[in-house]
Amino acid sequence: MEASAGLVAGSHNRNELVVIHNHEEPKPLKNLDGQFCEICGDQIGLTVEGDLFVACNECGFPACRPCYEYERREGTQNCPQCKTRYKRLRGSPRVEGDEDEEDIDDIEYEFNIEHEQDKHKHSAEAMLYGKMSYGRGPEDDENGRFPPVIAGGHSGEFPVGGGYGNGEHGLHKRVHPYPSSEAGSEGGWRERMDDWKLQHGNLGPEPDDDPEMGLIDEARQPLSRKVPIASSKINPYRMVIVARLVILAVFLRYRLLNPVHDALGLWLTSVICEIWFAVSWILDQFPKWFPIERETYLDRLSLRYEREGEPNMLAPVDVFVSTVDPLKEPPLVTSNTVLSILAMDYPVEKISCYVSDDGASMLTFESLSETAEFARKWVPFCKKFSIEPRAPEMYFTLKVDYLQDKVHPTFVKERRAMKREYEEFKVRINAQVAKASKVPLEGWIMQDGTPWPGNNTKDHPGMIQVFLGHSGGFDVEGHELPRLVYVSREKRPGFQHHKKAGAMNALVRVAGVLTNAPFMLNLDCDHYVNNSKAVREAMCFLMDPQIGKKVCYVQFPQRFDGIDTNDRYANRNTVFFDINMKGLDGIQGPVYVGTGCVFKRQALYGYEPPKGPKRPKMISCGCCPCFGRRRKNKKFSKNDMNGDVAALGGAEGDKEHLMSEMNFEKTFGQSSIFVTSTLMEEGGVPPSSSPAVLLKEAIHVISCGYEDKTEWGTELGWIYGSITEDILTGFKMHCRGWRSIYCMPKRPAFKGSAPINLSDRLNQVLRWALGSVEIFFSRHSPLWYGYKGGKLKWLERFAYANTTIYPFTSIPLLAYCILPAICLLTDKFIMPPISTFASLFFISLFMSIIVTGILELRWSGVSIEEWWRNEQFWVIGGISAHLFAVVQGLLKILAGIDTNFTVTSKATDDDDFGELYAFKWTTLLIPPTTVLIINIVGVVAGISDAINNGYQSWGPLFGKLFFSFWVIVHLYPFLKGLMGRQNRTPTIVVIWSVLLASIFSLLWVRIDPFVLKTKGPDTSKCGINC
């Protein structure tokens, strides 16, 4: 899609369009050659799935299947090059020492049931060719087929030599002839194999070797690898978890069998809370059983897909940026995000940036226009000097030596000029913001005098404007810029718009019509690209021929700027991103967290991952004790749908084709062009499509009624039903059998802003928790959804269940935080007097908790300070935001009372941490304040009671005081937040404190702790001699 001359606004019926030029036709890809075995010289061949056979996933040493199987059966079972033990691959028999792997599931080959004679015959034939040369001539390949390296990706094969077909250009390397032996005999094969092994170390490069052989071998190797946690770190951690589970069971048994008869209410409440905490701990702990890390190889990605002199074969990527309210999400923040996207280290023709303005704000539109103009200067500057990060606001405010590693003589001069250009750009944006603060009575007017179509934000047509791209002009150095598209979907009264999820689905459809990239990057407007190679990092997984087929998305961790040094309110959330997410990556992949995620478009369309040969389900029919019938899978997959469409023909075929097209329209909507794009797995727009028709369809697919009677939001795209649509969307993909990847490059891929103010932070946590409660009560709850097919792994289900259950922990947590004060005020306790033996249970439990935390920090690299801040805010958020989320969720489910969430403000104060000390009153502050005062009153009452009754009461008091102080210490950051910068409590909090203190003072007087508890004779009756 090319840059248009003006804004395109209209609905499906209005047909308001502008004329644009033809789209650039996609460049053809070249056919590429195959590979040959380093041992016998035979062609390596294909796997059972049609991919190039790779014997060793670690080094990619070229070996054909017969040599690979012989080495596993008769040899050392190790790769000749890297000495790594060969793993069993699909289509090969098992040997002693093989591990069970769920992805290799072919019983017909696994136990070597048949085809033994065929394999020996093929081996003998391969050796005959191996004596002659390192490859075959064109006459040996009857069909002219070459094994594709890019599985499920772009069409075309990977080059291993110069040309195709003749000896001069092909890969042609002489090898020493093997000793003559009967070609078909097993002994001859073994003799030649052993001879090759003995001579392998002495075979040096020949004079006529291809100089690119080293690069080719490097390009054949995997684009990424798993890095398991060292066994010395993870094994003790697992043993302590098991020990803690046993200790917890013994502790709970003791608690249940030893009630406190004079305080049954307190005892029963505490036991129920402890059981709930145990269940919550299990759901949180065991998904961290298999943590892994990953490494990517960007150089191999370039060697494989960016070969010199050939078309760039990296996959196109559509980038989505969403914004709603420019007053809470400043245009300057959004502009920096867009500029960092346009300046990414990725081919410009492969990048398209779509900005969704769900508030239909003219301020956002005009600021994006200014951003497009500034990008013509900023993008070439970034690429010329390779600066990081490529968001100008963050780059120019970095307090580092910006001259480090810079050798270009004009860098300083051009940097100063660019900084001045950016400052002028900021002034223009600020002027637009100031102008937008006063809305005219007649509404906004565009520069050409026409009214702004989005003056009524709840009733306006769809709008599209293409700012940059193929026909949008060039940068200051004459180079093309990535495409930049402004999108505002149509809104009309009476239609449900589904907030952010609906806006994202509209972007998916618009991009599907205009560019249709096979991959999509989703970013919030305040999350800029901090690592210009972030998309390349994701492509190392998504375009990997071995693992990319079943990957639905690559999730990056969230990192933040502008957080205070102590991270008072645990904004960095490193415990979740550096511990929990690594654990999930070892199971079925991390959950989707709403931003910083690269999706596979086909996964968002509801398709299932491609299926390889699977072991048949053993459903015995009674006629055979070993084998059964294969269970039929009635779920539709993309391959089935493509096959059905391709098989149609004749009169009946036309009828079936019509029915199939109607089914597609019921699924994807009534846009034939968009439906066609969903079947293009490799992406791209049909060359025959007219740009005017594409623009008309783009307006159509963002119309307010397009999703009616379709599966958008239920099975396709971002899933509706919760304000935390990210959890639901990732959950649906995992239930279909996809897996996700967690990518943590050394330089953080994306960075955003976090609410450092206490009230804003609690409101953010409230929104997340409310979304979890909505999912818990919906039909997509992990407790009962997704069991059919068994594609969601159990530990992954545990993790998803924990994401929906955790808000309910607020109820027992609140009760447990109040119990210490009640015990101090009533002089009772939740446990009976314990013996020396029983005290071992408590000591063991506390020790196991401490050791588990220490070992977890050891393998994850999280600091103890970050862990402690997370624990503190877990209590603060648990007794405030999570509690309110449960109440609001129940009101919404039971009474139908809906609660609208507010967008978290991204504005910054002139002071670096001005927002940190600002006090904003919210009802979320009431429960923690109440708990804090109750415990302080309880501590004072307990100490006064002990002083009044003598030293014999100090022993039992220490346990109660420790219990209460533990609660107060967890709430300390909350107390500092209430005090603010001036270390004085705001008036509203003082009023609440006095009110609550008065209530508990009356309660204290009723208990009367200063009066002697022992009863004696009445002096009025016995006289002075009593």
From Swiss-Prot:
- What Enzyme Commission number(s) appear in the record? 2.4.1.12
Which residues does Zn(2+) 1 bind? C37, C40, C64, C67
Q: Which GO terms describe its molecular function?
A: cellulose synthase (UDP-forming) activity; zinc ion binding
Residues where Phosphoserine is found: S185
Q: Which GO terms describe its biological process?
A: cellulose biosynthetic process; plant-type cell wall biogenesis; plant-type secondary cell wall biogenesis; rhamnogalacturonan I side chain metabolic process
Q: Which residues form a coiled coil?
A: 412-433
Q: Where, by residue number, does UDP-alpha-D-glucose bind?
A: S322, K328, E329, D358, K499
Q: How does the record say this protein sits in the membrane?
A: Multi-pass membrane protein
Topological region Extracellular: 253-262, 826-836, 894-922, 976-984
- Needed co-factor(s): Zn(2+); Mn(2+)
Q: Which UniProt keywords apply?
A: Acetylation, Cell membrane, Cell wall biogenesis/degradation, Cellulose biosynthesis, Coiled coil, Glycoprotein, Glycosyltransferase, Lipoprotein, Manganese, Membrane, Metal-binding, Phosphoprotein, Transferase, Transmembrane, Transmembrane helix, Zinc, Zinc-finger
**Which residues are listed as membrane-spanning?**
234-252, 263-283, 805-825, 837-857, 873-893, 923-943, 955-975, 985-1005
Per the annotation, how and in what number is the cofactor bound? Answer: Binds 2 Zn(2+) ions per subunit.
Which pathway does this chain act in?
Glycan metabolism; plant cellulose biosynthesis
- Extract the InterPro entries matched here: Cellulose_synth (IPR005150), CES_Znf_RING (IPR027934), Nucleotide-diphossugar_trans (IPR029044), Znf_RING (IPR001841), Znf_RING/FYVE/PHD (IPR013083)
Function per UniProt: Catalytic subunit of cellulose synthase terminal complexes ('rosettes'), required for beta-1,4-glucan microfibril crystallization, a major mechanism of the cell wall formation. Involved in the secondary cell wall formation. Required for the xylem cell wall thickening.
- PANTHER family hit by this protein: X-BOX TRANSCRIPTION FACTOR-RELATED
The family classification in the record reads: Belongs to the glycosyltransferase 2 family. Plant cellulose synthase subfamily.
State how it assembles: Interacts with CESA4 and CESA8. Assembly with CESA4 and CESA8 is required for functional complex and localization in secondary cell wall deposition sites. Interacts with STL1 and STL2, but not with GOT1. Binds to TED6.
Spell out the protein name for this chain: Cellulose synthase A catalytic subunit 7 [UDP-forming]
What species is this protein from?
Answer: Arabidopsis thaliana (Mouse-ear cress)
Taxonomic lineage is: Eukaryota, Viridiplantae, Streptophyta, Embryophyta, Tracheophyta
